[in-house]
């Protein structure tokens, strides 16, 4: 099961990499429709990721790569299901087929709630980093990185508070700033996850 849990955690982050495509489209003044919650949120993509990693594992005779691929697939599915539960605009789970699944079809949340969900994502990052630090201390693993995790937890908490104010007061340009910071936060979370793999993998022992 080596790298399986690591794959699950990384896979839970992977689908939101499609925000990079949204950012590029925004910068180049191209249409952003069909870029978010489509390709990276498709069960076809999940299947392809698992199969590619299984093939690489067989060819290289490194079973842990197969475990990593399976974990990525599981994590991606978890992310997709969570998106279906907490977001109100649906997910194209069978991309490229033009079929969207929306558990909340016909339900329109209050504007203040939709706005609140954006800064809350920064809070989720903060809680994730804090959780990793607590897990490392409890297990006695990756202790040299705990201080850095505390710093990133503080950064994400501050970003949450800043965006909590800006989302309700900034009249224009909010999404550009928020999108850039979100991508940076996602990148940091990915790097820290890989760095903390000993701690994450110890969960399965």
Residue ranges and their predicted role:
Residues 1-205:
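N-terminal membrane-targeting hydrophobic helices
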